[in-house]
């Protein structure tokens, strides 16, 4: 299966693509993949992401662990698949509740920056410990 590349795809464009897909699949698809099931799928994908990260992390280099002998490129591909699946489910859930994921991300970044301000090197040098 070929995946078309979308350089510089915005979150809104991604939401639109998922919305178009879900509408094209119709009511039966929506009924069979309700929001509660979608959250369950999201949790499952987060578990797969955790396994992909552990597989890539050199500190977990147990040669007897499943997937340890897999080439790095395959491990990165698994990570990419997991991230893509998570993003799809986040987009679908956000659409179901009318949440703009871009706006949600910006609000989260503002909260993170308020809690953990980024200092320039000059500010760091001139501040007291």
Predicted regions, residues:
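Flexible "arm" and connector segments at domain edges
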Residues: 1-83, 87-129
């Amino acid at each position: 299966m070929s995946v078309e590349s979308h350089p510089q795809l915005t979150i809104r464009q991604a939401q639109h693509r998922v919305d178009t897909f879900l509408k094209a699949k119709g009511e039966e698809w929506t009924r069979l993949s309700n929001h509660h099931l979608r959250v369950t799928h999201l949790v499952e994908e987060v578990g797969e992401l955790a396994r992909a990260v552990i597989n890539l992390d050199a500190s977990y280099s147990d040669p007897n662990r499943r997937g340890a002998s897999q080439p790095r490129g395959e491990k990165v591909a698994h990570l990419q698949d997991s991230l893509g699946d998570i993003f799809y489910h986040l987009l679908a859930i956000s659409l179901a509740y009318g949440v703009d994921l871009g706006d949600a991300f910006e609000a989260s970044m503002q909260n993170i920056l308020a809690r953990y301000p980024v200092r320039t090197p000059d500010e760091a040098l001139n501040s007291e410990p």
